[in-house]
C-alpha cells in the first residue's frame, strides 16, 4: 500500500484495509486500460492486474467529500444496471437520501424532458462504466459530473472521479458502496466521529439471489425425512433423523405376527371351498354320464 496523501484524519484503519482485501477489491481483470495504469500495483504471473488499495481508499474519501458538498441529497443519482450492484445502490440511496436507478437505465432520463422519468441531478454515481455507459453518455451531454467504480479494463471517457476497484464481484461492489455511504455520513455529521461504529452491517449491501432465498425457505419448512421415505412413513415412525426403535401401537395392531394363525381361518376356508367346488364337480361329470352327448 502506497503512503497516503490524505490528512491524518482520513487515513484508513487496518480494519478497512482488511475488509477491502477480504472482499477482493484489489483483484482487477487481465486487461488494462491505459488511464487505469496509475492505479495498478503489479501484475501477477497469471495475468491478473492487482489494484493499489491505498489509491482505492483515497478515491473513496474524495468521492465522499464531493457527495457531502451537495446540499440536497436528492440531487445525487446512483445507478446500477449490473445485478450485483442493484441492492447496494438502493441501500445507499436509503441511507444517504440519494435517488436510485436500479436496473435498466431508460434512454432520455437526463436529456428528454418530456418523459415522466426525466431527472436533472447535479451528480451521478455509477457501478460500472461499461454497463452504465448510456447514463454516462447522457451525463456528458448535460454537463453532469460522474463518479464511477472502475476496474482495470473499464473505459474512463467522461468519468470525472474513478474509484479503482473490482466492480464485478458482489462482495467488492457491496463493500465499496457501504464504505462510501459510511464516509458520507461521517462528513455530514450523522456519525459523531470516526471512532463511532456504523450500526449498519456491510452484509446488507451484498447481492442476494431471490431464487436461492426461496429455495432456502422451502428447505427450512420441509419435515425431516419427508423426501426420502414419503409422508406416510413419517406417521409410522420416522422421527428426526432416525426410525423409532418400537413400532407405533396403531401399526402393530393391524398386522398379524408371522407364524400365528388367525382364529376361524381354517373353518371359513373349508366351508367356502366345499360349497364352491361341489357345483364344479357336477358340471364336469354331467357330460360323461349322459350318453346322448356327442363330442
Curated annotation (Swiss-Prot):
Upper classification of the organism: Eukaryota, Fungi, Dikarya, Ascomycota, Pezizomycotina
Function: Required for the assembly and/or stability of the 40S ribosomal subunit. Required for the processing of the 20S rRNA-precursor to mature 18S rRNA in a late step of the maturation of 40S ribosomal subunits.
Name assigned to this protein: Small ribosomal subunit protein uS2
Comp. bias (Low complexity): 274-295
Domain of life: Eukaryota
An individual GO BP term: ribosomal small subunit assembly
HAMAP family with a match to the protein in the record: Ribosomal_S2_euk (MF_03015)
Organism: Paracoccidioides lutzii (strain ATCC MYA-826 / Pb01)
This protein's UniProt keywords: Cytoplasm, Ribonucleoprotein, Ribosomal protein
Residues covered by region (Disordered): 273-295
One cellular component (GO) term of this entry: cytosolic small ribosomal subunit
Amino acid at each position: 500500500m502506497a503512503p497516503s496523501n490524505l490528512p491524518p484524519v482520513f487515513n484508513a484503519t487496518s480494519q478497512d484495509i482488511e475488509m477491502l482485501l477480504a472482499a477482493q477489491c484489489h483483484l482487477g481483470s487481465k486487461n488494462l486500460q491505459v488511464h487505469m495504469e496509475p492505479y495498478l500495483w503489479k501484475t501477477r504471473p497469471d495475468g491478473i492486474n492487482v489494484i493499489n488499495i491505498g489509491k482505492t481508499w483515497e478515491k473513496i474519501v474524495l468521492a465522499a467529500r464531493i457527495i457531502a458538498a451537495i446540499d440536497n441529497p436528492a440531487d445525487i443519482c446512483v445507478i446500477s444496471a449490473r445485478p450485483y450492484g442493484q441492492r447496494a445502490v438502493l441501500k445507499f440511496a436509503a441511507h444517504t437520501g440519494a435517488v436510485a436507478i436500479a436496473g435498466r437505465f431508460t434512454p432520455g432520463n437526463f436529456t428528454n424532458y418530456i418523459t415522466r422519468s426525466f431527472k436533472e441531478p447535479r451528480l451521478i454515481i455509477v457501478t460500472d462504466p461499461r454497463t452504465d455507459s448510456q447514463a454516462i453518455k447522457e451525463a456528458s451531454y448535460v454537463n453532469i459530473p460522474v463518479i464511477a467504480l472502475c476496474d482495470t479494463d473499464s473505459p474512463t471517457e467522461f468519468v470525472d472521479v474513478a474509484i479503482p476497484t473490482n466492480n464485478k464481484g458482489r462482495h467488492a461492489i457491496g463493500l465499496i458502496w457501504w464504505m462510501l455511504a459510511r464516509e458520507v455520513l461521517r462528513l455530514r455529521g450523522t456519525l459523531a466521529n470516526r471512532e463511532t461504529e456504523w450500526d449498519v452491517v456491510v452484509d446488507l449491501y451484498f447481492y442476494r439471489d431471490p431464487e436461492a432465498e426461496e429455495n432456502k425457505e422451502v428447505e427450512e419448512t420441509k419435515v425431516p425425512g419427508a423426501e426420502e421415505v414419503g409422508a406416510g412413513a413419517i406417521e409410522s415412525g420416522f422421527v428426526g433423523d432416525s426410525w423409532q426403535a418400537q413400532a407405533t401401537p396403531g401399526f402393530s395392531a393391524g398386522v398379524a405376527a408371522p407364524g400365528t394363525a388367525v382364529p376361524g381361518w381354517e373353518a371359513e376356508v373349508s366351508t367356502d371351498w366345499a360349497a364352491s367346488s361341489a357345483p364344479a364337480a357336477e358340471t364336469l361329470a354331467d357330460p360323461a354320464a349322459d350318453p346322448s352327448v356327442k363330442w
